[in-house]
């Protein structure tokens, strides 16, 4: 059967669900796709469709980020379901780095947990502009304690640089909304959530006029067709027939885009902000990997050495407990990958304490492109 074309009838925005493990992120994601499909059309994704890796099903948690789509009255949403488990923080960073806004889930019956704090901090660090808070599991919560939970979350938002007083809070039960899609009382919270997202999440200005650039998040081999790379386009546009380069980590390769899709629908052209899959001519799956970028020819040059001005987060800000010295080899998170680098401090600087500002030189073990943000 021929694939449908993707029709741009509404503004597109990238959002996602973050928060502590088992606070209901995947359940809410499934509920939103069901509700959006019922009201505005689209594909229903149930819980098992989203939690679809064997290890995830076995452990009942989300490991890699999952992309789904749904619509509100005003917008088309690409939604990433982020893992909450502590072992998978770098996957959470991969998802959060693509978000224009995020839904932070907090279970009303238990309140903020360790990963709640961590995800708020990470969202701030990777540049998520705004959060909407969904107080979940209201059907299990003590009504007298819910106000205290909300106050505690607002304090956390203020602590990590968000506006705790102005951030919207929605109360509901994602499980009830998913289980009773025809019950207006159960789905009222989804109506409120989508309406709030439409009003509160600002669609950023997309860099459409810059050279095409897309960090590669995943790589697939499709029998009979070739290799597909997926990711969110950071800037520019791409269409079938465009020549592109695969840059970073390995020697640069040149290829041609032979197909562009978004959510299994054909795209005339992918543009900044779109989550796409690009089919590449003559590239084997083992020749490309997550962490590389797809880019317009000659538009970027990878580097292994750079100078940076940094602030070292203190223990209270979710950062280091101890100082570090020249020769320290941390992980640098760039877009969709992490790269080890060796730190050299300026002459006369013996060490960097938590809370310090300093300049330093970094030598990466694999090259990255100039201007890349890192955490």
UniProtKB/Swiss-Prot annotation:
UniProt keyword annotation of Endoplasmic reticulum present: no
Lineage: superkingdom: Bacteria
Positions of region (G2): 60-64
Reaction catalysed by this enzyme: GTP + H2O = GDP + phosphate + H(+)
Start and end residues of each stretch annotated as G1: 19-26
Annotated region (G4), positions in chain: 136-139
Molecular-function GO terms, alphabetical: GTP binding; GTPase activity; translation elongation factor activity
Binding site for GTP: 19-26, 81-85, 136-139
One Pfam match: GTP_EFTU_D3
Region (G3): 81-84
Subunit structure: Monomer.
Family: Belongs to the TRAFAC class translation factor GTPase superfamily. Classic translation factor GTPase family. EF-Tu/EF-1A subfamily.
Record's function text: GTP hydrolase that promotes the GTP-dependent binding of aminoacyl-tRNA to the A-site of ribosomes during protein biosynthesis.
Protein name (record): Elongation factor Tu
Upper classification of the organism: Bacteria, Pseudomonadati, Spirochaetota, Spirochaetia, Spirochaetales
Gene that produces this protein: tuf
């Amino acid at each position: 059967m021929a694939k449908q074309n993707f029709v741009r009838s509404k503004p597109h925005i990238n959002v996602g669900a973050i928060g502590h493990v088992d606070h209901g992120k995947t359940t809410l994601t499934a509920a939103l796709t069901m509700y959006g499909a019922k009201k505005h059309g689209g594909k229903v994704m149930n819980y098992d469709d989203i939690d679809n890796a064997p290890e995830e099903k076995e452990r009942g948690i989300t490991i890699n980020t999952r992309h789904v789509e749904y619509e509100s009255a005003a917008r088309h949403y690409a939604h990433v379901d982020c893992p909450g488990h502590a072992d998978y923080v770098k996957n959470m960073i991969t998802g959060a780095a693509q978000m224009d806004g995020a839904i932070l889930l907090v279970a009303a019956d238990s309140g903020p947990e360790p990963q709640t704090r961590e995800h708020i901090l990470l969202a701030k660090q990777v540049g998520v502009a705004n959060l909407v808070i969904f107080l979940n599991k209201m059907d299990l919560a003590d009504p007298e304690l819910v106000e205290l939970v909300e106050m505690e979350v607002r304090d956390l938002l203020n602590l990590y640089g968000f506006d705790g007083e102005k951030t919207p809070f929605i109360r509901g039960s994602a499980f009830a909304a998913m289980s009773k899609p025809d019950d207006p009382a159960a789905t009222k919270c989804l109506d409120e959530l989508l309406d709030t997202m439409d009003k509160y999440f600002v669609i950023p200005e997309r860099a459409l006029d810059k050279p095409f650039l897309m960090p590669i998040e995943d790589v697939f081999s499709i029998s009979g067709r070739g290799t597909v790379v997926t990711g969110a386009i950071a800037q520019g546009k791409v269409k079938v027939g465009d020549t592109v380069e695969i840059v970073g980590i390995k020697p640069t390769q040149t290829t041609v885009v032979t197909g562009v899709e978004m959510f299994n629908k054909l795209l005339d052209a992918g543009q900044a902000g779109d989550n796409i899959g690009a089919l590449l001519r003559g590239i084997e799956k083992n020749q490309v990997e997550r962490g590389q970028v797809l880019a317009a020819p000659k538009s970027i040059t990878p580097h292994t050495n750079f100078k940076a001005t940094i602030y070292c987060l203190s223990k209270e800000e979710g950062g280091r407990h101890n100082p570090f010295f020249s020769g320290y080899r941390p992980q640098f998170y760039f877009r969709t990958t992490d790269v080890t680098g060796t730190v050299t401090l300026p002459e006369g600087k013996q060490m960097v304490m938590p809370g310090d500002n300093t300049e330093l030189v970094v030598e990466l073990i694999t090259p990255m492109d100039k201007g890349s943000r890192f955490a």
